[in-house]
């Protein structure tokens, strides 16, 4: 479903309280604090309904705990009873390199493995993350260059769609965008094409703009 086809728009903080189980939502944001508030609300609502929730980002765990506590999440309670899991992970940068020689690919794989092993292990290994009902992935993939964009899309196809999507987990995955409207309107630019492709891969989208303006709706 395209943006034009969607007839049901909601405020992001309301939308995340109504996400159906098993749906994957992409969150494009211009303002980090707004994106965090939306993500935390998604986690908070899950905990209220006794869901196991996991939050993955590059931020230090104690900082995330403090920020969650500030909006009223009982962090100590839910981490103690294993309903809330907070992980600090390394952002992925080069999941896929299509045109490199074999030796360079193997070298990159070896170097990459140490950096991303904690991320992929947490996502794939139930003993590490349990069977989380809700997961927030905050910027777990860098998209600063065209090669990283290509790599990210391969990760979206090969990992999230094939692994996480079929696990039944409900997910919010966030990406920073400097200017959402101008970027997605540029159909010829690499970032505009990338955003449009992601809209085809997710069940819903949240656009979180500056000054706490935003809109969210289902895509499927």
Identify the residue ranges that each predicted region occupies.
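Non-catalytic regulatory/interaction regions at protein termini and inter-domain linkers
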Residues: 1-220
């Amino acid at each position: 479903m395209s943006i034009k086809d969607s007839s049901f728009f909601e405020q992001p903080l309301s939308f995340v309280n109504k996400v159906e189980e098993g749906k994957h939502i992409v969150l494009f944001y211009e303002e980090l604090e707004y994106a965090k508030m939306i993500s935390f609300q998604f986690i908070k609502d899950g905990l209220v309904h006794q869901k196991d929730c996991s939050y993955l980002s590059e931020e230090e765990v104690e900082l995330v705990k403090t920020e969650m506590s500030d909006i009223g999440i009982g962090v100590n309670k839910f981490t103690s009873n294993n309903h809330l899991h907070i992980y600090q992970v390394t952002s992925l940068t080069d999941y896929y390199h299509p045109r490199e020689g074999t030796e360079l690919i193997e070298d990159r794989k070896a170097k990459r493995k140490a950096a991303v092993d904690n991320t992929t292990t947490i996502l794939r290994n139930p003993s590490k993350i349990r069977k989380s009902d809700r997961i927030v992935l905050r910027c777990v993939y860098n998209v600063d260059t065209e090669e990283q964009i290509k790599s990210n899309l391969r990760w979206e196809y090969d990992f999230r769609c094939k692994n996480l999507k079929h696990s039944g987990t409900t997910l919010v995955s966030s990406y920073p965008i400097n200017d959402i409207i101008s970027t997605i309107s540029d159909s010829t630019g690499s970032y505009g094409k990338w955003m449009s492709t992601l809209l085809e891969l997710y069940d819903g989208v949240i656009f979180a703009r500056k000054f706490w303006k935003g809109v969210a709706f289902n895509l499927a």
